[in-house]
From Swiss-Prot:
Coiled-coil ranges from the UniProt annotation: 31-58
Protein name: Nucleoporin NUP192
Anything else known: Present with 2520 molecules/cell in log phase SD medium.
A GO CC annotation given for this chain: nuclear envelope
UniProt keyword DNA-binding, yes or no: no
GO MF annotation terms: structural constituent of nuclear pore
Function per UniProt: Functions as a component of the nuclear pore complex (NPC). NPC components, collectively referred to as nucleoporins (NUPs), can play the role of both NPC structural components and of docking or interaction partners for transiently associated nuclear transport factors. NUP192 is located to the NPC core at the nuclear membrane and is essential for de novo assembly of NPCs.
Native source organism of the sequence: Saccharomyces cerevisiae (strain ATCC 204508 / S288c)
Main location: nucleus
KW Protein transport (keyword) present: yes
A biological-process GO annotation: mRNA transport
Length: 1683
């Protein structure tokens, strides 16, 4: 046998995926046929001794040596499960390393086996090979009974272990949790075995095996008659007997004969289940006989073979057992509110015990005592004693029926799970369909028997005997059958519709027949039965019409009947009161029961009234509003009156009235007036809250009264008037009349909440029985939630932008009054009190270990928990609005005629967060609930945690580095389990949209608690698996820590991989793409943050994260579809469809993913360049840039940029044009379907604007031509249009932003590869050329429409070209230029010429073009090609460059002049320098020369403070300009042009050349802080340069004067010394700067004396240069000092 769960899990998954693995099925077939059995592998000495030797051999032949710890774990598991020790070892080895996981593997294996077998048996046709393989050799059929028995054995062993633990005082929480775990699995197994058994019957696998049928019946008969597990066999038996035609005739007759004998057995009465099954066999036997009358019916004697045995079975309790089957599986019996009505079931169940899950209980005796169904006639006797049935002090019938029974449960029974067992959906379906067929068969084929029973009962009543209700109920089998129908069909409209679908049917005829019953008990049961057939709108309408059209039993008759009884009881109370007064004077006791009987008020009357109320309540529950209104007119007044008299059915009457409450709030006035009058009209009230609460307790005297009242109150304050997609009441509306109670009490709704909170909820924990407690808690929590939703909080925030007058929008006198009336305010007030919020917290504090599984009826508990967490979440959402806005309004402006408790305040709570943080177990439970399957519970728990985290991060009080939530989660005992809960939720299968939304919220929670830069540890670090002690680490090798390999971080990586796996290049769906993006964002944040980056990178490298994700990295082409739709913006309609669907979500998510992944790669390579070896770095880099196999992977990252922009919106808005909508507030929709944005907040604002303007339509500002209705319609249309419009804007902006981010990240990645990638110069230069080949076409395109994108790529090109130049110098550079660079140069020229280019972009183009020209000048062929292309467009080019040089600010001035320099050099190679010609044709050259004066002006601005950066920039520009002019001066024509453009005149005007070399220049710098001064005065001379910083060369005067003298020399040399005019001008210049010339020569003489001529000091070298220039000029011009 295979003991690992893995092969069965694999087979199960193959079934789920729709691709059944037949080979694996054949391999595990023996295990499947063996079901859950391991009876041949129980613990034994041989295996134990082998294990204790330390070496074991597994079933597959492999051997292991094991240590003592492992041996101990294996023995422990073996003892607990009574399992072979070697098998225990195999289970542990197949799972994780603990016995607990071995146990999980054991039960999971069994679970998978049974699920697979059930699927094959029930879903495959009996002729299929798969099914035939499974049942061949009969092993499966022969094992199924043993499988059931094996579970009995294991449950029995569990009980023994419990007894042992209790004796040893080891029965702790952990032990109990372990027991519950095993019982849960065994219960599921039993349920699935039931399905398998049914399937085998259905497929006929056991139909020819009468011995098996009899042994199965014997097995069921031997079970205790109160064992709920009997129910699991009933679907198979019912279906078996319904399929008698499939059995051989001889077998049917043999069964018939056997059952006849069994009924005559004296001991048969002890086996009621067997009697009931035999009865059902006979019911079907009649039909079987009818199918072939000649061979079957004619050979039988109907009386002896059918009638008498069936009658005998009825007398032995067959119908009572059927009633128990129906009642203990009914939905209605699980509804505690049904106990408001008379518990007629206890009356009619006289002989047979109810079913209890006895095999799942620790102590069934306690449970049996508390659920004993035997009717106790003493209760009736008690009622007949002194107090009497209708005595005002009588506490109510409930004390003798179900509720009292439950209230009397001992405390410890509440600790039990399994108080209610619910069948799984599949088993339930089999059970319901087969049981329905049983009941319909009895109605159809056993009419003779029902008539016989009815006649016998009526004869008994007519016999004249004085029969008590107790006597009647003993033989009331027809009533039992009616009740069976009631319990079975109630709340199952899909089955009960059979009775109404055809008026000619036997089912409808049965109802007609029943309606003619005259006996009171029969009539009562008839009304109950019909009430069960009214569930569902259609059935309710049928019942409504049935009584409406029935002359003998009409609705009016029923109402009259209720009214008559009301008068009788009222008269009885008066009569009793008078007699009591008389008796006091005569000293005689009054027998109130005798008085009641005189008035005809006995227990039957209670039953009858209860059945009428049940009928009315059931019909009114689901009918439409028109029918409800009609019934309300008939019954409301009658029922109102009924509640005024003290009866045990007041609560029931309240429940029925609650069903009559109309949906429309304005129609509820009558109900409110009645209820308010009932409670307060006759009460003595004063100013105290206690007097108001006493008014309630005087009216609501019993548990049932309170329960009924709560249901009525909940329906009365329920919200119907709400806007679309909103759960809040329309602002300004109330669910009750304004100034409720005016005239006889303090007005308002507050007294109701005061009573509910202080008298009920605050004391609810005193109710012992858990089901009773929940029955009260549930309506109260619903009331609280409804109350919180009764105020639209968004209106206060939106009132200013909407220009709303709140007084005009409310139904009250003004807004302040509305606030005082609204239910939300009292609810907030009471929730802020400790006893109330603790009561709500107690609901949540049940803990994940006490959650009931679905099979044990966990629905009510789940609903309670859901409500409790939703309430907490809602309170946290709006508590600030209450504290800051609503509370002060009531406090300051509250009117005195309204009810307001004296202690109205915030009750010491600054914030509701404080209440939660003080309850540490609550916070821990919320963490654990994140992992449960219940989406509502998990989602709301997570949202509360998100708020708590945000609060504790941002609170002023929290100055410590650890926030409160992190501290709590890290310190509680459940810390590891909380982390495991998050892991479980993230790893759960995505079965619907809700699960997906929850995963995304969980990932958002983690992301929001992570920072890119902060070194503070957060809750996300803990949850992800870091150890967050003083120093963060990957933690120990324990589960949930990263080091162990089973952490939330690992789950995150798995989600990322799984999501990418489901994406192809053909189609990218929104959901997986969004999941992948969210997961990667978290990993990226951890890698960015210095706190975690080092730890995480080492872990990710070990896990081969780079390789795993790169393999799955999604690629896109122009044919890729996005969530099924192509990116097509060719038409407005296609673009609209794309944007308003999930497609745009898929597209944007992909862009975000691509951005994150590119960023990650850049960070990763940069990080590993420091820590890894050269070969390791190159491995990763080559993966990205290698092109040996296919195109470079790196370049595919830019593929998304090939898509065009999303087209701009063309909708025009009118109503919402000037609305101040903040598009940044619009978030992503939590669900991945439809429009991807959540416009909830925006819709609220637009809705308010629409309402305000509609109300103002007739004011001056609005046209009277539009009606209010028309305006509202137009506004609704425009609201839809607005959402479409904003969807487009947001999507377009987001796409542009993300595209730019992708590009920016890619640019950074390329830069990192080039600088940190450890590439050889030749490889790197080739890679750079490939990059140029990719980006140049893109630059060319982007220049025309997207400058921002161009700037990114051009800045990259500048960066790369610089490195390329350096690399080429290291490689033997032959002076040729790679042809691929020419396209770059052309693109630069195109960019410079583009009117869209920014100054910064042009500056980069100048640099690139200059780099290229610098290289091409040494290449003759290249130079000529460039010259040819430039000649054509040189005029415009020169104009643009010149413009930047002369008028530009920033780098373009310098880069432009450098490019002009290179262009001049290039043009010098042609006959005519067309560049220079272009400059000379206008004043361009003159203006360039004049720009030298800018520097002069800056240096002479002694009154202004100079910025150091400005100085350095200006000096750079000055030198660049001078060197450009020198370049121009290199030719005679150029020098001549300079002279013509006043070069020498401008030089003569430069003040800094006239400076005294000894005194120097005085400069004033700001932005330099010295002592108390904000500026600094500095003197710069020839000897003392200005040092800007310690690493830079100083700024010397030589920086300025050397270039100028070089320029003068260049002009003079080019013009020649024969040009007298030039020589004379230069002579004049030397004379002008005579002081400077003398100063330089002086310094030269001093140097010679000090022998510093050859010093390497930069200043010294500049002096040498200057001396040479002056000497040369003096020589060429013949200048003498005396000149």
């Amino acid at each position: 046998m295979k003991w690992s769960a893995i092969p069965f899990q694999t087979l199960y998954r193959s079934i789920e995926s729709g691709e059944f693995d037949f080979d694996l099925f054949k391999e595990v077939l023996p295990d499947l046929q063996n079901l859950n059995l391991n009876t041949d592998k129980l613990k034994n000495n041989a295996s134990r001794s082998q294990l204790e030797k330390g070496e074991i051999e597994l079933s597959d032949g492999s051997t292991f040596k094991v240590n003592q710890e492992f041996i101990f774990e294996a023995i422990s598991l073996s003892d607990e499960l009574n399992l072979d020790e070697i098998v225990a070892c195999e289970l542990i080895l197949s799972g994780d390393t603990t016995a607990n996981n071995g146990k999980v593997q054991y039960f999971l294996r069994r679970q998978y086996i049974l699920q697979i077998v059930s699927f094959i048996v029930n879903c495959f046709h009996e002729d299929t090979e798969l099914y035939q393989e499974l049942i061949k050799n009969g092993a499966l059929v022969s094992n199924i009974l043993s499988a059931f028995k094996f579970i009995h054995t294991q449950l029995s062993e569990i009980k023994q272990q419990i007894n042992k633990a209790q004796i040893l005082e080891n029965y702790n929480a952990l032990f109990q949790q372990n027991i519950k775990f095993r019982r849960d699995f065994l219960l599921r197994e039993y349920d699935i075995l039931s399905q398998i058994l049914y399937g085998l019957v259905d497929k006929g696998a056991i139909m020819k095996n009468k011995d098996f049928i009899l042994s199965l019946l014997h097995h069921v008969s031997e079970l205790d008659s109160n064992d709920f597990f009997i129910i699991y066999y009933t679907p198979a038996f019912f279906h078996l007997f319904a399929s008698l035609r499939v059995l051989p005739d001889a077998d049917v007759k043999l069964l018939h004969s056997q059952f006849m004998k069994d009924l005559k057995d004296d001991s048969i009465y002890t086996k009621p289940v067997k009697v009931a099954l035999i009865f059902i066999f006979f019911a079907y036997f009649i039909g079987w006989c009818k199918e072939d009358p000649k061979r079957r019916a004619d050979t039988m004697d109907f009386k002896t073979d059918v009638d008498e045995p069936m009658t005998s079975a009825v007398e032995l309790g067959a119908i009572e057992q059927i009633l128990i089957f129906a009642a203990d599986t009914s939905i209605v019996e699980q509804d505690k509110s049904m106990e408001l009505f008379y518990d007629i079931r206890s009356l009619l169940e006289r002989h047979i015990p109810r079913l209890i899950p006895k095999q799942l209980l620790d102590d069934e005796k306690i449970f049996s005592q508390t659920t004993n169904s035997t009717y106790n006639p003493a209760s009736a006797t008690d009622n007949m004693s002194g107090r009497g049935l209708w005595n005002p002090s009588y506490p109510g019938m409930m004390s003798t029926t179900g509720t009292a029974r439950l209230n009397s449960m001992p405390n410890n029974v509440n600790e039990y799970s399994y108080t209610t067992i619910v069948l799984s959906d599949q088993t339930q379906e089999f059970f319901l369909s087969s049981f329905d067929d049983v009941l319909q068969t009895i109605i159809t084929d056993c009419a003779f028997l029902l008539t016989k029973i009815k006649d016998a009962e009526e004869d008994s009543l007519l016999s004249g005997e004085d029969l008590t209700l107790d006597d009647i109920s003993l033989k009331a089998d027809l009533e039992r059958f009616f009740l069976s129908i009631y319990f079975f069909y109630a709340s199952r409209p899909e089955y009960s519709c059979t009775f109404w679908s055809d008026k000619e049917s036997n089912a409808y005829g049965f109802i007609e027949w029943c309606s003619r019953c005259n006996d009171n008990l029969m009539r009562s049961c008839f009304y109950l039965m019909v009430s069960s057939l009214s569930f569902g709108p259609e059935n309710a309408l049928n019942v409504y019409h049935y009584f409406g059209e029935n002359s003998s039993i009409s609705w009016k008759n029923i109402a009259q009947c209720l009214s008559d009884y009301t008068k009788k009881i009222s008269n009885f109370n008066s009569s009793l009161h008078k007699r009591q007064q008389f008796s006091e004077s005569t000293h005689n006791d009054i027998d109130s029961t005798a008085v009641a009987l005189e008035e005809g008020l006995n227990e039957e009357a209670v039953i009858f009234l209860s059945s009428l109320l049940t009928l009315v309540g059931s019909v009114t529950y689901q009918v439409d509003e028109d029918v409800k209104s009609s019934l309300s007119k008939v019954f409301s007044d009658v029922l109102f009156e009924f509640t005024k008299i003290n009866t045990p059915l007041v609560g029931a009457a309240f429940k029925v009235i609650s069903n009559l409450v109309p949906k429309l709030e304005s129609s509820r006035t009558k109900f409110w007036s009645f209820l308010d009058s009932l409670i307060f009209k006759d009460s003595s009230l004063n100013y105290s809250s206690e007097s108001y609460r006493n008014a309630f307790t005087n009216v609501l005297t019993k548990y049932s009264d309170v329960l009924g009242f709560l249901q009525l109150f909940h329906n009365l304050i329920s919200i119907h008037s709400r806007e679309n997609n909103s759960e809040y009441m329309v602002f300004g509306k109330l669910a009750f009349p304004t100034r409720l109670g005016q005239g006889y009490r303090k007005v308002g709704i507050w007294p109701y909440f005061d009573y509910i909170f202080n008298d009920i909820l605050a004391h609810v924990d005193q109710i012992v029985d858990i089901r009773n407690k929940r029955a009260v808690q549930l309506p109260i929590l619903k009331i609280i939630y409804t109350g919180l939703c009764s105020f639209d909080y968004s209106v206060i925030l939106n009132s200013i932008p909407a220009a709303a007058n709140l007084d005009a929008l409310v139904d009250c006198e003004n807004f302040f009054n509305y606030v005082q009336e609204c239910p939300a305010i009292p609810i907030f007030n009471y929730i802020f009190t400790e006893k109330i919020y603790k009561s709500i917290f107690n609901v949540v504090d049940v803990g994940v270990d006490q959650l009931s599984i679905e099979l044990e009826g966990g629905k009510n508990q789940a609903e309670l928990l859901q409500l409790a967490v939703k309430i907490i979440n809602k309170v946290l959402d709006y508590q600030e609005t209450y504290v800051e806005e609503l509370f002060p309004i009531v406090k300051k402006h509250g009117k005195t005629d309204y009810f307001l408790p004296k202690n109205y305040s915030l009750h010491g709570l600054r914030s509701f967060y404080d209440a939660i943080f003080f309850n540490i177990p609550l916070v821990a439970h919320l963490g654990l609930y994140v992992g449960v399957d219940d989406q509502i519970l998990a989602t709301n728990s997570l949202r509360i945690l998100a708020k708590l985290s945000e609060r504790s991060n941002g609170s002023v009080a929290s100055l410590s580095k650890r926030n409160k939530l992190l501290t709590i989660f890290d310190s509680v005992d459940e810390s590891a389990r909380i982390k495991d809960a998050f892991i479980t939720q993230l790893e759960s299968s995505i079965t619907d949209a809700g699960v997906l939304a929850l995963k995304l919220e969980l990932l958002d929670f983690l992301t929001s608690n992570l920072s890119n830069y902060s070194r503070t540890m957060t809750i996300s670090h803990l949850l992800l698996g870091f150890q967050v002690s003083n120093v963060i680490s990957l933690g120990p090798n324990l589960a949930t820590f990263i080091s162990s390999g089973t952490s939330l971080l690992d789950s995150l990586i798995s989600v990322l991989e799984a999501s990418l796996n489901s994406i192809t290049k053909d189609n990218i769906d929104y959901a997986p793409m969004r999941l992948a993006t969210a997961a990667l964002e978290i990993i990226l944040k951890l890698c960015r943050n210095p706190l975690t980056s080092g730890l995480l990178y080492s872990y990710l490298i070990k896990e081969n994260f780079f390789e795993r994700i790169m393999i799955l990295d999604p690629q896109v082409t122009r044919f890729t579809t996005w969530n099924g739709s192509p990116f097509d913006n060719s038409t407005e309609e296609k673009c609209k469809n794309f944007i308003e669907s999930e497609s745009v979500g898929a597209f944007l998510s992909f862009l975000a993913y691509r951005n994150y992944w590119t960023q990650y790669l850049g960070l990763f390579i940069h990080k590993i360049s420091f820590s890894g070896t050269k070969s390791e770095v190159l491995t990763y880099v080559n993966y990205l840039i290698s092109n040996t196999m296919y195109s470079v992977r790196l370049f595919s990252f830019l593929d998304p940029l090939n898509y065009g922009n999303i087209c701009e919106p063309k909708e025009t808005l009118s109503i919402f044009t000037n609305v101040p909508l903040n598009l940044e507030q619009v978030t992503l929709n939590k669900y991945c379907s439809g429009n991807i944005y959540d416009f909830h907040k925006m819709e609220n604002l637009m809705r308010l604007i629409k309402r305000v303007r509609a109300e103002s339509l007739h004011s001056n500002s609005f046209s009277l031509t539009v009606s209010k209705e028309q305006f509202l319609k137009d506004a609704d249309v425009e609201c839809i249009k607005a959402k479409s419009h904003f969807t487009n804007i947001i999507s377009r902006n987001k796409a542009l932003e993300l595209n730019l981010s992708v590009l920016h990240s890619w640019v950074q990645l390329v830069q990192i590869i080039v600088t940190d990638g450890k590439l050889e110069p030749s490889t790197r230069s080739n890679f750079i050329l490939e990059v140029f080949g990719t980006i140049i076409p893109k630059i060319s395109d982007y220049i025309e429409f997207n400058i921002t994108f161009s700037e990114e790529l051009v800045s990259l090109a500048v960066f790369l070209f610089d490195i390329y130049n350096r690399d080429r110098k290291l490689i033997t550079d032959k002076g040729t230029v790679d042809g691929r660079l020419y396209q770059l140069f052309k693109t630069c020229i195109q960019g410079i010429n583009s009117p869209l280019s920014s100054v910064a972009l042009r500056s980069d183009f100048y640099i690139l073009a200059n780099h290229y020209l610098s290289r091409v000048l040494s290449d003759q062929v290249g130079s000529e090609k460039v010259l040819q292309d430039l000649r054509l467009g040189s005029k415009k080019l020169v104009e643009i460059i010149w413009n930047d040089v002369v008028y530009g600010e920033g780098t373009s001035r310098v880069t432009g002049i450098l490019l002009l320099d290179s262009l001049i050099q290039l043009a010098n190679r042609s006959k005519e320098n067309f560049i220079l010609d272009s400059l000379m044709k206008t004043t361009r050259l003159l203006l360039i020369i004049r720009s030298l004066k800018n520097t002069d002006a800056l240096l002479n601005s002694t009154t202004e403070h100079i910025n150091i950066d400005d100085l350095l920039y200006e000096l750079t520009a000055f030198k660049a300009t001078v060197f450009f002019l020198i370049r121009v001066a290199e030719t005679r024509g150029g020098a001549s042009a300079l002279i013509e453009n006043n070069l020498f005149r401008i030089i003569a005007e430069l003040s800094f050349l006239k400076v005294d070399p000894d005194l120097g220049l005085d400069l004033m710098f700001d932005e330099v802080y010295v002592q108390n001064s904000k500026f600094l005065k500095v003197n710069v001379t020839l000897d003392n340069p200005l040092l800007v910083d310690k690493d830079a060369n100083g700024v010397s005067l030589f920086e300025l004067i050397v270039p100028i003298f070089q320029l003068i020399s260049a002009v003079l040399v080019s013009m020649g010394s024969s040009n007298k005019a030039v020589v004379q001008t230069v002579k004049g210049l030397l004379n002008t700067y005579k002081r400077l010339v003398i100063g330089i020569f002086k310094r030269d003489l001093l140097r010679e004396k000090e022998d510093k001529k050859n010093s390497s000091d930069p200043n010294n070298q500049s002096l040498n240069e200057m001396v040479k220039l002056i000497v040369m000029l003096c020589t060429l011009t013949g200048y003498q000092n005396n000149d």
